[in-house]
């Protein structure tokens, strides 16, 4: 079973690559394919069990958009074929419509969903996060210079319980299209949320979903959830 990690040399802020290290630590038979910006993506001719991409700098967003724009048709095919994608942090914006910079410059993105990200590089948004995925509680963080906006009703990945969603005016966080899942929430997401990680492992075909250090991970997850839900804790 193969997982493709897109551009780990640049999409590695906030420890996001630990998501993949944790999967590999938990499931020894996984093969991790790291695709660099100069490589032909593995997904171009194959169907990985999971495609992952994490957070990057604003400059590198433009490099990644330029690279992936060549493969929009293939990415659309994979989404339609229910291949699993997990996209975290500001990588969410890559697959949206556009990014508007402070100088009004517009960066066109891949346009798989109708979101406009608005940058404010003088004000970083930091927040604790609690949300809901089906019947699973989600905990994590947000740390970003952007919020995303849309005039359309999207299918959110998470329903926010505490913090905000894609922007301060909505509780809808992220997006889910078939098995394509993208969210601003970081953590690393899979380490902080073992129930979600076990769900994802089962989804991609892993039979024994026992995680590395599962007992400790669950203890930390439950402690963090209870702590984040206390009203005395300020979110942002």
Please identify what each model-predicted range represents.
Residues 1, 134-138, 175-181:
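Beta-strand-turn-beta hairpins that frame and shape the catalytic cleft
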